[in-house]
């Protein structure tokens, strides 16, 4: 087989993996946005043709002003710019670094990971127990998330109001961790098309530095596999401790993504 044919095959496999990564991320965000809208957030959404666009003009954060699907369809960026302009927000677009215009500094750089769910070994921590959250525990779960991430008050409020809409859904798993009998950690995953997206993950400051994040990655991978998903996926800020945790847990780095402001692309 010619050398260039081998390279092409590998490139196609890498592209397929990143496309799968993009699909599960889009599905997970779609579900979170649906929960936020159910909680009363004024979030305008355009969803179709492999793209997902959101705009929350009155919300003081960019977390809902976002465009997904453009890593696979960069030629449609103009649709995102028009959507954000229509709703009066400076949204953000997730792109492959190769498609980011030169001279523009991304707002965020993210490492993407995906691997077989049964490949991640357990990572027990002395005194730590992890279990799936039921309806009665969702308030405790979200308080750990809020304290762990420490968002601005408006974001904390929407997270609290959204949380009841996350529990009791077969596609979503919420996990809470107790260290020596005290609640210390919380995490979640979203399941779609045979892949589990590892999303929220927070450890209270008093319990950090013990390997709890790594333990939660392993537990969510186990639960994902138990529910019929072949793979798990996640992303993390380039160079962040969370990226090191994903790599240390055995997840495979598959590439990078960048987040670009719409105003920088206009």
Labelled PLM ranges:
Residues 1-28, 68-71, 75, 112, ...:
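Short amphipathic alpha-helix that is part of the acyltransferase structural core
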Residues 1-86, 92:
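N-terminal charged segments
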Residues 44-49, 97-105, 124, 171-185:
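Conserved beta-hairpin
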Residues 70-136, 239-242, 258-262:
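Acyl-donor-binding surface of acyltransferase catalytic domains
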Residues 74-82, 203-205, 209-226, 244, ...:
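Conserved acetyl-CoA-binding loop-helix of GNAT-fold acetyltransferases
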Residues 93, 198, 232-236:
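Conserved hydrophobic beta-strand within the GNAT/NAT acetyltransferase core sheet
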Residues 101-102, 245-247, 251:
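Conserved active-site tyrosine of GNAT-family acetyltransferases
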Residues 153-206:
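A conserved beta-strand-loop-helix scaffold within acyl/acetyltransferase catalytic domains
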């Amino acid at each position: 087989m010619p050398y260039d044919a081998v390279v092409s095959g590998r490139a196609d496999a890498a592209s397929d993996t990143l496309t799968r990564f993009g699909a599960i991320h889009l599905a997970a965000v779609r579900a979170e946005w649906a929960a936020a809208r159910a909680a009363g957030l004024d979030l305008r959404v355009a969803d179709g043709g492999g793209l997902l666009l959101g705009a929350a003009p009155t919300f003081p954060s960019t977390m809902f002003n976002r465009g997904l699907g453009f890593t696979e369809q960069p030629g449609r960026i103009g649709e995102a710019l028009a959507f954000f302009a229509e709703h009066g927000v400076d949204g953000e677009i997730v792109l492959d670094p190769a498609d980011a215009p030169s001279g523009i500094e991304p707002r965020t750089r993210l490492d993407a990971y995906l691997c077989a769910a049964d490949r991640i070994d357990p990572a027990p921590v002395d005194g730590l127990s992890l279990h799936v959250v039921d309806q009665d525990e969702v308030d405790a779960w979200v308080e750990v998330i809020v304290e762990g991430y420490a968002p601005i008050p408006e974001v904390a409020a929407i997270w609290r109001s959204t949380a009841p809409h996350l529990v009791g859904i077969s596609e979503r798993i919420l996990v809470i961790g107790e260290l020596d009998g005290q609640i210390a950690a919380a995490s979640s995953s979203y399941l779609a098309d045979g892949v589990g997206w590892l999303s929220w993950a927070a450890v209270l400051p008093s319990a950090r530095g013990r390997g709890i994040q790594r333990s939660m990655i392993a537990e969510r991978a186990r639960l994902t596999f138990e529910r019929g998903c072949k793979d798990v996926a996640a992303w993390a800020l380039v160079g962040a401790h969370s990226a090191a945790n994903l790599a240390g847990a055995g997840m495979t780095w598959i590439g990078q993504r960048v987040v670009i402001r719409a105003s920088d692309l206009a």
